[in-house]
Design a protein with these regions (language model features):
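Active-site ExK catalytic segment of metal-dependent nucleases
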Residues: 110-121
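Short, hydrophobic beta-strand segments that form beta-sheet elements in well-ordered domains
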Residues: 114, 137-143
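Short, conserved loop/helix-junction motifs that constitute active-site signature segments
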Residues: 131-134
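Domain-level recognition of nuclease-like catalytic cores that cleave nucleotide substrates
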Residues: 146-174
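Active-site-adjacent loop/helix micro-motif of nuclease/hydrolase catalytic cores
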Residues: 119-129
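Accessory nucleic acid-recognition modules appended to NTPase machines
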Residues: 1-110
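Conserved beta-strand termini and adjacent loop/short-helix elements that scaffold enzyme active sites
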Residues: 31, 92-94, 142-144, 158-160
Length: 174
């Protein structure tokens, strides 16, 4: 929050108030770091994502990550509202600089780690590191410009259509 406040030349308290207002208006949502059980984890700041991915300018990687964040957020809210699950979406960043974009937690258990790349299909080392240490049910690297999906070292490297395609096909799960 202090970095954002510094760039905007406002106080951190004002930045937090603005962010809270934007969240209440459904312009942005925040994803907080996972720190439970991770002694070297960074506990602040949250990542901020736009509900409307058209608001993301420039960096294709940031746009891809924001799009996946929106899809995961929608899926989490659907699971909570329609099926009664307690779902939380977090990210992981530690003091050594390792980061995984998303950690899907359902009923207080880590279910999936998700890393997003625009075109790099080489396995993300922090994803491997945390998949080995935290042992989620699934570890996924979503690559937007992926030529061919593959699995290696208990990690799936897939396209966004493969990850979210069933959600986009009405009637497929009936």
């Amino acid at each position: 929050m202090a970095n954002l406040a510094g760039e905007l030349e406002i106080s951190p308290i004002t930045a937090k108030r603005w962010l809270d207002l934007l969240e209440r208006m459904y312009v942005v949502f925040t994803v907080w770091p996972l720190s439970k059980g991770l002694p070297r984890a960074i506990r602040k700041p949250p990542k901020v994502y736009f509900y409307d991915t058209g608001d993301i300018l420039g960096d294709e990687g940031a746009r891809a990550e924001n799009l996946v964040a929106c899809e995961l957020k929608k899926l989490a809210e659907f699971r909570e509202d329609s099926e009664g699950y307690n779902v939380d979406l977090k990210y992981i960043r530690d003091k050594e600089g390792r980061e995984v974009d998303f950690a899907w937690i359902e009923e207080n258990k880590l279910q999936e780690l998700v890393e997003v790349k625009f075109s790099d299909d080489s396995l993300h080392k922090p994803l491997i590191y945390y998949a080995q240490r935290l042992n989620p049910n699934r570890a996924t690297q979503i690559v937007f410009n992926l030529k061919r999906s593959f699995s290696k070292a208990r990690l799936d490297v897939i396209s966004p259509i493969e990850r979210f395609g069933d959600l986009l096909a009405p009637g497929k799960n009936k």
